[in-house]
């Protein structure tokens, strides 16, 4: 559900302070964060964030297309494990063939 327009976008204040400090000094360092729910603002473009996925930190380089999305959208929390093809073929084959 979208956030109310009168409230504005949510950005963790400490994260915003770190980005502002890096923008003033023109540095490009990786910013480590647990704040997956912070919305990406135009100030974040060009920075790399290490977003925690519950197990490890995933590096996310922010581009202009990501503005308005949340940081957590780009650091998946679940790993997809495929079904092995041999087991799938066994299930499809009918007994007696």
Swiss-Prot record:
InterPro entries in UniProt: Ribosomal_uS19 (IPR002222), Ribosomal_uS19_bac-type (IPR005732), Ribosomal_uS19_CS (IPR020934), Ribosomal_uS19_SF (IPR023575)
PROSITE patterns reported for this sequence: RIBOSOMAL_S19
Record keywords, A-Z: Ribonucleoprotein, Ribosomal protein, RNA-binding, rRNA-binding
Gene Ontology biological process terms in this record: ribosomal small subunit assembly; translation
Bilayer-crossing regions: none
Gene Ontology cellular component terms for the protein in this record: cytoplasm; small ribosomal subunit
Matching Pfam families: Ribosomal_S19
Signal sequence bounds: none
GO MF entries: rRNA binding; structural constituent of ribosome
Purpose: Protein S19 forms a complex with S13 that binds strongly to the 16S ribosomal RNA.
Family named by the database record: Belongs to the universal ribosomal protein uS19 family.
Protein name per UniProt: Small ribosomal subunit protein uS19
Organism: Salinibacter ruber (strain DSM 13855 / M31)
